[in-house]
Amino acid sequence: MTRQPRVGVIMGSDSDWSVMQDAAHALAEFDIPIEVRVVSAHRTPAEMFDYARNAVDRSIAVIIAGAGGAAHLPGMVASATPLPVIGVPVPLARLDGLDSLLSIVQMPAGVPVATVSIGGARNAGLLAVRILGSSDLQLRAQLVAFQDRLADTVRAKDADLQRFRGKLIGD
């Protein structure tokens, strides 16, 4: 039996998938079912609004929207849904994604979009996990274990560096 998707991962173009797949991978690490769609704010606005308005009916709880250039997709989706929307600025050849970042982060009052770094789809996926984990104790426990593993990795790298440094200066 297929589980209902909990997170929608959408992008303005299929070329954005090279960035947005990092969100999908992060969500898969926590076994969160997703749906993935290409929904363009400029080329298919009716479908975009339909997607946003009906996401709740499909049991979607969070939408991650990636877009480059003018990057209107996250904000327009946020205007049409009560769900949290996480915007991912997708870097393009021109301006390295700065235009996308500014477009997504500068939302008017009343239409919030949580925005991650340029190309930060993995963090968008992890933020979606945290949002879901705020009301799911089992998922929250998985997040705590994930954070513990991150901390252990940093401690191990520090220990390696201290050993290496000691060899260099004769400690």
From Swiss-Prot:
MF (Gene Ontology): 5-(carboxyamino)imidazole ribonucleotide mutase activity
UniProt keyword terms in alphabetical order: Isomerase, Purine biosynthesis
UniProt-recorded name of the protein: N5-carboxyaminoimidazole ribonucleotide mutase
Family note: Belongs to the AIR carboxylase family. Class I subfamily.
EC number in record: 5.4.99.18
Binding positions (substrate): S13, D16, R43
Reaction catalysed by this enzyme: 5-carboxyamino-1-(5-phospho-D-ribosyl)imidazole + H(+) = 5-amino-1-(5-phospho-D-ribosyl)imidazole-4-carboxylate
Pathway: Purine metabolism; IMP biosynthesis via de novo pathway; 5-amino-1-(5-phospho-D-ribosyl)imidazole-4-carboxylate from 5-amino-1-(5-phospho-D-ribosyl)imidazole (N5-CAIR route): step 2/2
Broadest EC class assigned to this enzyme: isomerase
Intrachain S-S bonds: none
Signal sequence annotation: none
Keyword Coiled coil (UniProt): no
One Pfam family from the record: AIRC
Chain's role: Catalyzes the conversion of N5-carboxyaminoimidazole ribonucleotide (N5-CAIR) to 4-carboxy-5-aminoimidazole ribonucleotide (CAIR).
Superkingdom of this protein's organism: Bacteria
Biological processes per GO annotation: 'de novo' IMP biosynthetic process
